[in-house]
Amino acid sequence: MASLSGPISPTSLEMFKPGVEEFNPSKLLLLSNHQEGLLYPTILGSLELLSFKRERSLNLQRDKVCLLHQESHLLKLRGTGTDTTDVLLKQPTAISVNCCHDGTFTTWEQDRMPKTSTAPTLTESSGSLVTRLILIPRLTLSIGIQVAMRLFRLGFRLARYSLKVTILKAQEGLLLIPDLLRVHPIEPLVQDRVVEPILAIEPLPLV
């Protein structure tokens, strides 16, 4: 007591009395922490903070430290010619920060985000697809030939006339194939064989 300067009042000596002091709401003060911008309730003559307030302040402090670290990381990129616009947009969703309870930054960790592939999915191999494209005309032609042979045997006049028109249209299409290929080229998957124009077509026996 002798080391204290100035007179000592009786009210100031009451703070150093031994024993448990009764809680007095008038002694509750709100001391502002200018560094973190938070309010800490404390009691005169006590240096301890309330547990729930302290835990809450540490959580806020942890978030502040992590945000400041992100900003400082972007500030390092400034002036080096790096565009940080995309980084600001992608960081909140693609990057998470781990901090200790005392507000100390620990590690950066990439989130496990599902990666979507933009490449087209091939359901069939190119070889099987080409084989199917080759088999389809053969099947169609075989069915058409069988139907034509039956109609020729029956001798229906209308059927023979319709077949003649169909065959003439098919011959015209075969002659136009080279010109159509220049306007509408075939896809690379099917363009394995060079289509040659048919110069002479033998006339079919139409009765």
Curated annotation (Swiss-Prot):
Signal sequence, start to end: none
Gene Ontology, cellular component aspect: virion component
InterPro entries tied to this protein: Corona_nucI (IPR004876), N2-like_embe-CoV (IPR044311)
Entry annotated with the keyword Chaperone: no
Known role: Structural protein that is not essential for the viral replication either in tissue culture or in its natural host.
Further comment: The gene encoding this protein is included within the N gene (alternative ORF).
Stated name of the protein: Protein I
The species this protein was found in: Porcine hemagglutinating encephalomyelitis virus (strain 67N)
Organism placement in taxonomy: Viruses, Riboviria, Orthornavirae, Pisuviricota, Pisoniviricetes
